[in-house]
């Protein structure tokens, strides 16, 4: 692994342990040339995924972009980083095991919405407003009524 500080190719692993929900290995590394310390993550990649954008353009799947989408929707919300990582890992696992190499951005967006719905209602509405391209207050009202109906249904005695 190349040192991000000095560019040396000779770095040493000082510590390895499972990370997140055991879907990655966290490695602490040190560079003998400059003494720099840094962390890397190693994940299993079942297949190369390509995202098919709405414009028809294709782009390599970027797990970090998926994480950023969650972080933006969940900004200033009381959701642990571990829960975000588990949600992202679950989505990536489902995408990789789907058998498809090209995944539409719409499919990814729907999976993010589904995950956010179970993580945080406010984040769900935030993400939905961008994903579904809300342009009127009524759009927000409709999604909020859907959430309210679901909450009422979940709390019915039975």
Swiss-Prot record:
Domain ATP-cone: start-end pairs: 49-139
Essential cofactor(s): Zn(2+)
Xref: HAMAP family: NrdR
Keywords (A to Z) from UniProt: ATP-binding, DNA-binding, Metal-binding, Nucleotide-binding, Repressor, Transcription, Transcription regulation, Zinc, Zinc-finger
Name used for this protein in its record: Transcriptional repressor NrdR
Species, as recorded: Allorhizobium ampelinum (strain ATCC BAA-846 / DSM 112012 / S4) (Agrobacterium vitis (strain S4))
A GO MF term: zinc ion binding
NCBIfam families linked: transcriptional regulator NrdR (TIGR00244)
Chain intervals annotated as zinc finger (unnamed): 3-34
Disordered: annotated span: 1-22
Biased composition (Basic and acidic residues): 11-22
GO annotation terms (biological process): negative regulation of DNA-templated transcription
Cofactor descriptive note: Binds 1 zinc ion.
Homology family: Belongs to the NrdR family.
Entry function: Negatively regulates transcription of bacterial ribonucleotide reductase nrd genes and operons by binding to NrdR-boxes.
Coiled-coil regions listed: none
